[in-house]
């Protein structure tokens, strides 16, 4: 698929006082993209659309260039100690995505230009924990790879972490646009993960993302560039024929990764879950979705901040975990399963 290009761009005035802000302003001006001003990346008004659904879809192709003022990093367990905030929002239209509710009324994509401030804060966290390793997740609230061909913020983060003694970087993507990252000086300190799923899930619930085959071609490229490789199987979803669907996923993964060094391969396994607010938003934004959001079939699990979520019942969740682990053991016997949640 073609790399993401926004249809509309907003700038905070302060963003233009940073080199990246100036560079992006010149780039989008040359591309002929409409540019507007906003007082804050948190308060973007005037996104076009006659209905809420139309405004939502237009917001997904709107980029906001701003300054990150909150420099206290969120926790990102179990993936990493901290989430490093390079961007917020995503151009994809995955029906199940938790950003549907965490970003709520702000589904536009935000990128932050004060990278030196962000990296300085990351260095403080690294120094506090040294000599322990400190891991940073760069894709907690965005698919950073999908927009990085425009900003190169992720590339700078890879090289910043690559130069540290005790920092490590990780991120996950559904996009194939990795070429500009292949020559980054990562020094083996970045784990590049791809989100994969059964054909059913990708075909029905992941519009606006790269195909499975394109993701795998990109995975071969990044492995060839010496990055540590990982796969996030998420969300693991019990559709009709799911056992066969996920078997074919791992079988095809093994086939397409033949000849790649998989000595340090990782898998992360995340079952499908949703909240009541998410269900409302998903059904509003994707009224024809085939996603099964029937609470009566699920177990209610309390989460952080008192917000509960619906996950599979214990027996079904165990069956999912055991099945995935058995497929991984068969096709990738030396891989590490980092967690199932």
UniProtKB/Swiss-Prot annotation:
Cofactor stoichiometry and binding remark:
Binds 1 [4Fe-4S] cluster per subunit. The cluster is coordinated with 3 cysteines and an exchangeable S-adenosyl-L-methionine.
GO CC, sorted alphabetically, is: endospore-forming forespore
Q: Which gene encodes it?
A: splG
Residues binding [4Fe-4S] cluster: 90, 94, 97
Enzyme Commission (EC) number: 4.1.99.14
Please give the subunit comment from the record: Monomer or homodimer.
Which NCBIfam families does the UniProt record give?
photo_TT_lyase
* Gene Ontology terms for molecular function: 4 iron, 4 sulfur cluster binding; DNA binding; DNA photolyase activity; metal ion binding; S-adenosyl-L-methionine binding
What InterPro entries does the record tag this protein with? rSAM, SPL, SPL_Bacilli, SPL_firmicutes
All copies of domain Radical SAM core, residue ranges: 76-304
Entry protein name: Spore photoproduct lyase
Q: What biological function has been recorded for the protein in this entry?
A: Involved in repair of UV radiation-induced DNA damage during spore germination. Can repair thymine dimer 5-thyminyl-5,6-dihydrothymine (known as spore photoproduct (SP)) by in situ monomerization of SP to two thymines.
Picking any one GO biological process from the record gives:
sporulation resulting in formation of a cellular spore
According to the UniProt record, what class of enzyme is this?
Answer: lyase
Needs which cofactor? [4Fe-4S] cluster; S-adenosyl-L-methionine
Q: Which reaction does it catalyse?
A: (5R)-5,6-dihydro-5-(thymidin-7-yl)thymidine in DNA = a thymidine dimer in DNA
Task: State the family it belongs to.
Answer: Belongs to the radical SAM superfamily. SPL family.
- State the DNA-binding region(s): 217-234
Q: Which UniProt keywords apply?
A: 4Fe-4S, DNA damage, DNA repair, DNA-binding, Iron, Iron-sulfur, Lyase, Metal-binding, S-adenosyl-L-methionine, Sporulation
UniProt superkingdom: Bacteria
């Amino acid at each position: 698929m073609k790399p993401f290009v926004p249809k509309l761009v907003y700038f905070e005035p302060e963003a233009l006082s940073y080199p990246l802000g100036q560079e992006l302003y010149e780039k989008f001006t040359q591309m002929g993209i409409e540019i507007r001003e906003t007082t804050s990346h948190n308060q973007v008004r005037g996104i076009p659309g006659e209905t809420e659904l139309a405004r939502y879809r237009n917001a997904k192709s709107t980029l906001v260039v701003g300054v990150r003022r909150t420099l206290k990093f969120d926790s990102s367990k179990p993936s990493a100690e901290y989430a490093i905030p390079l961007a917020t929002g995503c151009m994809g239209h995955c029906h199940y995505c938790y950003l549907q509710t965490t970003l709520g009324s702000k589904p536009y994509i935000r990128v932050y230009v004060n990278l030196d401030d962000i990296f300085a804060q990351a260095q403080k966290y690294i120094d506090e924990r040294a000599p322990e390793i400190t891991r940073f997740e760069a894709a907690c609230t965005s698919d950073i790879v999908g927009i990085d061909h425009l900003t190169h913020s992720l590339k700078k983060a890879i090289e910043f972490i690559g130069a540290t003694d005790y920092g490590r970087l990780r991120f996950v993507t559904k996009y194939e646009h990795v070429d500009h990252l292949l020559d980054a000086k990562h020094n083996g300190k970045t784990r590049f993960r791809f989100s994969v799923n059964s054909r059913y899930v990708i075909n029905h619930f992941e519009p606006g993302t790269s195909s499975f085959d394109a993701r795998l071609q990109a995975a071969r490229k990044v492995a060839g560039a010496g990055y540590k490789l990982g796969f996030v199987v998420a969300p693991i979803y019990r559709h009709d024929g799911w056992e066969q669907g996920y078997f074919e996923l791992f079988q095809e993964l093994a086939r397409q990764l033949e000849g790649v060094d998989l000595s340090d391969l990782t898998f992360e396994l995340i079952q499908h879950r949703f909240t009541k607010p998410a269900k409302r938003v998903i059904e509003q934004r994707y009224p024809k979705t085939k996603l099964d959001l029937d609470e009566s079939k699920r177990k209610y699990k309390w989460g952080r901040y008192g917000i509960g979520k619906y996950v599979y019942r214990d027996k079904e969740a165990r069956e999912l975990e055991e099945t995935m682990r058995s497929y991984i053991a068969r096709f990738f016997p030396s891989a590490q399963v980092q967690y199932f949640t």
